[in-house]
Amino acid sequence: MDHVEKLISDVKLSSVVPGRITGDDKLQHEFTNMDLIMKLHYIKALYFFKNEVVEGLHIHDLKLPMFNLLELYYPISGRIRRNDGGDGGGGGGRPFMKCNDSGVRVVEAKCKNKTIDEWLAMNDSDHDELVYDQLLGPDLGFSPLVFIQFTWFKCGGMSIGLSWAHILGDSFSASNFLNIWAKIMVGQQISPQFLQKSTKTNKLINNNNNNNPILSTTRKFPFSLKRVDPVGDHWKITNNIKMQSHSLHITQKQLNQLLSKVCGTYYKVKPFDVICATLWKMLAKVRGEYSSEPAIVTIIRGDHDNETTEVVSSNNQVTISTVEANDVKVSDVDTSKLTELIGEKTVDETRIVEELMEKENGVSDFIVYGANLTFVNLEEAMIYDLELRGKKPIFASYNISGVGDEGVILVLPRLEGGRIVNLVLPQKQIEGLKNKMRVELGIF
């Protein structure tokens, strides 16, 4: 996108490290099996703030709280090693985090020719320029896991773009990271944090598989995973088709109309389930014109309660489920039937996914997002809890990169009510879906 590259200028990179040296007792952080399942995926977050909110803020003001933040989140400043790979990170063993205080990257940039409103009116894929393009490797032992990009616009407003390696944690974790950064900026005291590990997962780590009866339950390969060719120390996937991003903006009025259309007066259904069912059917119609319908979809949810909003979690809250449309043609079946399947007939594969990774000693390479058509529930994510000077962003969004060919759909809260639906799908499907959503539902 040459026209976008010219809009972004004065790019500067620097590093921020923890304010204090990490102690010897914290020098190594073990990844859970679910962390390693997610290692080829990356979370991209983007926030926009108006001029009056950020006026007078300098990069020093934005970086200063990070020193304290990284004391709390010390593993995030580390670098990935393998248990037989030495300081360079190479080798073929199970990855772990060496907490060596190497830091996170901070990116400063300017957009001198566009206001925030003008940028938001541009193509969705242009947003990628505001979030640093991050991949781990091929020098794995020297690759930062987090990039934070601050971009100032012609109007004086600013965007914050977070690139977060999914191996660190899910979208809720990434959101917590930024929310706590903002709290530290205004002087709020934060209790010591650390990357929580799931007890159900930790008991699998470093156990002898032959003596662990739990592992015997994994008899079949999970539908929610796709094994990919070994990637070595360059953690990226290669798509066979061109993928494209797009966002659907569903107002509260449109959401109410959709719920009423699908379920009538039975409002006990969850908006996420209805949105997923609607898009599943629409995409089945689009794909049915030239290929097979998606009969199995993956549902990813974050099992977060109120107690987790003030801790740094790993991926242990992630639940991975599949839904199969047996003996029905998805493009013809009533949307309410698909809603019922998603709400009541999901098969939780989280445990067998973790067990599979443990059996393979954490070294095999899989994808989750895009192995099947994948729906991600971020309705409860606190993305609008990030406040600067007491003001919320005018727009916030999360997306996933490193997505398989089947695509991913994220459902997020919308500031004014309703939902934002972010799509990463094969380019051919995007146009067909946009047309059907516009014609049948009036949603753009």
Where are these regions (language model features)?
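Low-complexity, glycine/alanine/valine/leucine- and proline-rich hydrophobic stretches
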Residues: 368-444
